[in-house]
Each structure stands twice: as C-alpha cells, then as structure tokens.
Amino acid sequence: THDQLDRALDAGARFIVSPGFNPDMVRYGLSKGALMVPGTATPGEMEQAMALGLEVVKFFPAEQNGGVAKLKALAGPYKTLKWMPTGGVNAKNLADYLAFDQIVACGGTWMVKKDLIQQENWAEITRLSREAVRTMLGFSLDHVGINCGSEAEADRLARTLCDMFGFAYQMGNSSVQALHAVECTKAPGRGTHGHIAIATSNVDRAVYHLGLYGVHCLPETRKTDAKGK
C-alpha cells in the first residue's frame, strides 16, 4: 500500500521490493524517488515494468515458475532486463542463479526463517547469512605464482615440477604453468617472491566484500574480455 511504502522510506529504505506487479504502486514509488523492484512472473508483467522505465524486476516465485532455465529463455527477447529471483532460492541453488549475468541479486527466507526470528536465534541467522555470502562469492584457491627472473628460469622450474609430479606443461605469454596450479612468471611480478591467486565467481562482488575488511584492490591490475568480464 501507499502507507507501507511511505513508512518503509521514512525508515530509511533505499529500494522497495514487492511480491507482485501493481502499476499504481510502481508509479507512486517512482514519484517518491524510490528504486522499485516489483514482482513479476510473466513476459506481460515484465514488459509493463519496462514500459514504466524499470530495468530490474523481481522474479517470483522463481522455482515454481521455471527457475534459472526460464530466465535464460526470457533473456532472448529481454536482453536488457535484469532479475532478482526469490521463492525457492536456497543455499543449494543460489550459485546457479547468480552465475547467470542478467541476475543482479537473489533473495530467500532460508537465511531468516520465521522460527529463528521468534526464537531470537541470531547466531544461526548469522551463520546462514555468512554461508550465503560464501556461496555467492565462491572463493577458492586458483594457483600459486612464483616470481622468476627470466623466461628460461620460469621454463626450467615449470618443467621440473611437471616431471616430478606429472603435471601438464603450458607455455603462456607472461608465464609458464604447471597444471594451472603453479604459475612461474617470466619476470618478477607483484610480491617479493610471488603471489597466491584466489578465484571468485564474481569479481565486482568480491571487491566490495573484501573492501568491508579493509582490503584495497588495485584497479590497474584488472583484466577483462571484450564483454567487460
């Protein structure tokens, strides 16, 4: 309702998410300067939302309406539309949703179950929320980098590791790799002796998350493909 939206904004809300699509509520929220994310389930509702100038809509209930496979099909005609799936999203399928680049975020009550709130079990809510963040980021050890002084030194070290452990040898432009697990750089890189590379499912989300811990990333070291990924 208008009253609920007003109270949410007065309480400091910066965006409004609704279960369904009500054009009147969307227009009212936009008139108040709110970022509106209404619930949609059909192409018709999505087109109405786009006609109002929205670029992001909620997809609800997600699993019952076909899940990420449905959204990938809808992405054909709606290439610029972004989605926020909720409904049936949980720790087991969260990564599958977020792997699709037209999904900006996911929501789910599995992190804040009603009984946990009633029991004031904040520790369990915290654990589930942290688990969701870890799942979203998908951090894993990618490789260890070793600084070498020359291409010959890098080649020699990589071949030694490959011979000793049966790793696959791969020559690259700036380094030589042993099974993608060890990168021997052809010239000294960052770090005194080398680096530890941590992989993530989303660089932008990882940069934001690490920033909360005081980690500063160097933008000049970022490499992207033709699509900016």
Predicted regions and their residues:
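N-terminal beta-strand motif that seeds the catalytic metal site of vicinal oxygen chelate
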Residues: 133-158, 191-198
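C-terminal helical cap(s) of enzyme catalytic domains, especially alpha/beta-barrels
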Residues: 29-33, 115-137
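Catalytic beta/alpha-barrel core
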Residues: 1, 5-6, 12-22, 35-46, ...
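Glycine-enriched alpha-helix->loop->beta-strand junction motifs that scaffold or abut catalytic
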Residues: 10-16, 30-37, 51-56, 77-81, ...
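Glycine-rich phosphate-binding active-site loops on the catalytic face of alpha/beta enzymes
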Residues: 19-25, 58-68, 102-125
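Core segments of cupin and vicinal oxygen chelate
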Residues: 145-183, 205, 212, 223-228
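Catalytic cores of alpha/beta
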Residues: 2-11, 44-53, 69, 89-105
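Vicinal oxygen chelate
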Residues: 126-127, 139, 181-187, 211-229
